[in-house]
Amino acid sequence: MRKQFLIAYRGYSSIAPENTKLAFQAAQVFDFDGIWIDIQLTKDKQIVVTHKENFKVSNKNLNLNQINLVDLKKVNLASEFKLKVTSQQIQTLKEVLTQFIQPFKYLLIHIKDDKENNNSLLEQLNLLCKDFVLAKEKMILLSSNFHIIKLINETFKGFKTGFVIANKKALLVASRDELMRYCRFLVPNESFYHKNCKEIQNLGLPVILWVIKGLLRYQFYENDRFVKFQITAQIY
């Protein structure tokens, strides 16, 4: 039995294209406790699951906010993957929640920072979450923008949040009291946490750690009482 929750980074992305239905299905088959996914808005204000900010559509390289969902669905996300797999369409967040909120223990939703669309994305996300009774229980909303974390607390009553941090500069945007008030988790990347674990632990919040690479690192953090989730592209 695992000591912590093991979360598949953008799905089981070492064996399937990241942030695709196939990657999420693989994570389910291999018994991950949940998935980490990234969300952004399309031109027509649809929440889609992707880390990428631009796509080639009709032989043109376009930013995501220039593409409507119907055209984005034509892109094969598996075309450049290292293994030959079936064609994969981009997924809307609604499609992912419909299929995967039930079987997984947790869905970690990373809200990509886009100053032009942050408010619209949060409005759409808030409406969507109301359609899923398990949303508050199973979703953890993540952002590297502390302003977004505060907005989530104001508009998403009862939802768990995690502040994504990669360096000391990120820790300076909020006081310890603000972090305790607005965040349920701190979400440092592994290399930053490894070098600054005492400072982060002194903030007093549980940790979601990303991205773990290698069995030895995974086993090392198993004994860290602050680490509650390990995010990885491998099964351990």
Curated annotation (Swiss-Prot):
The lineage of its organism: Bacteria, Bacillati, Mycoplasmatota, Mycoplasmoidales, Mycoplasmoidaceae. InterPro entries: GP_PDE_dom, PLC-like_Pdiesterase_TIM-brl. One of its GO terms (molecular function) is phosphoric diester hydrolase activity. GO terms for biological process: lipid metabolic process. It comes from the Bacteria. Residues 4-236 form the GP-PDE domain. This is Uncharacterized protein MG385. The keyword Magnesium does not apply. Keywords: Hydrolase. To glycerophosphoryl diester phosphodiesterases (EC 3.1.4.46). To M.genitalium MG293. It holds the Pfam family GDPD.
